């Protein structure tokens, strides 16, 4: 009975309450969203007009960082926390363009993400999607071990997701990063970035709006210093060549970058290796 209830919750899509995953999909120009998500984005754009450019830049960063990890560090195993809806150049596509044997575990608990993700990935044996709350690190590791060998280097991605996590006893961002790093072998990497603003009015306004729109399924906009503090978790060593910065400027390559006309908030973070 409990399994049946869990499965029912997993497949139930609330089309009347915006979800962060569907809002992000809309900002990227996707089609996996509902009127409520589009209306919520319209409200968000009134407060932070550069949000669409921010979302596009963040997606380009995700592609760059996965490609960099695969080429420079030779890592072939990826954990993508809060993976979101499938779009172009997903993590497994970028990683497998470097090495087709690369393995990717997507972690999300949005029912629409799970539905479309499974349909999209059912033919790829090196990809697994887990219907998990990303704060449940131990359970995720146990399930991910079906295709991930934790005795070898893994890339743990927390890209544009920790702002969805509240600062509570169940699993605040630092605890999530700490718990994940404990699982990782030396030579692994961790990527962290989240939405930040140095303007307290923007932080408060966007946080309040997103909590209201998503039915309180949101954490908060943080400061650059708070994100930098996540990189002080034991065993993490920031990649010194680049450091922490607006991810639009993280190792820019031939990808076209559409600059934010205004910068009410940015996506801030970087990459760290695991000692």
Give names to the regions the model predicted.
Residues 170, 197, 203-204:
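Anion-recognition interface
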Residues 201-215:
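Short, glycine-/aromatic-enriched active-site segment of Class I SAM-dependent methyltransferases
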């Amino acid at each position: 009975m409990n399994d049946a209830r869990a499965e029912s919750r997993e497949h139930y899509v609330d089309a009347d309450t915006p979800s962060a995953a569907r809002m992000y999909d809309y900002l990227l120009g996707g089609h996996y969203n509902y009127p409520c998500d589009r209306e919520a984005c319209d409200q968000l754009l009134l407060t932070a007009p550069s949000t669409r450019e921010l979302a596009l830049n963040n997606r380009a960063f995700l592609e760059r960082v996965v490609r960099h990890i695969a080429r420079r560090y030779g890592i072939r195993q990826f954990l993508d926390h809060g993976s979101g809806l499938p779009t172009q150049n997903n993590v497994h596509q970028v990683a497998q363009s470097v090495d087709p044997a690369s393995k990717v575990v997507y972690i999300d608990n949005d029912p629409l993400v799970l539905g479309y993700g499974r349909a999209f990935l059912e033919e790829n044996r090196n990809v697994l999607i887990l219907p998990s709350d990303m704060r449940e690190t131990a359970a995720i590791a146990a399930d991910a071990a079906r295709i991930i060998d934790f005795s070898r280097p893994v890339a743990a991605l927390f890209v544009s997701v920790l702002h969805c996590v509240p600062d509570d006893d169940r699993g605040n961002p630092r605890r999530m990063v700490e718990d994940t790093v404990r699982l990782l072998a030396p030579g692994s990497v961790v990527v962290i970035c989240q939405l930040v603003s140095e303007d307290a009015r923007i932080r408060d306004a966007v946080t309040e709006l997103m909590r209201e729109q998503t039915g309180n399924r949101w954490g908060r906009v943080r400061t650059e210093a708070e994100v930098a503090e996540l990189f002080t978790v034991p065993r993490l060593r920031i990649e010194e060549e680049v450091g922490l910065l607006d991810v639009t400027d993280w190792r820019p390559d031939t990808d076209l970058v559409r600059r934010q006309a205004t910068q009410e908030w940015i996506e801030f973070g970087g990459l760290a290796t695991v000692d």
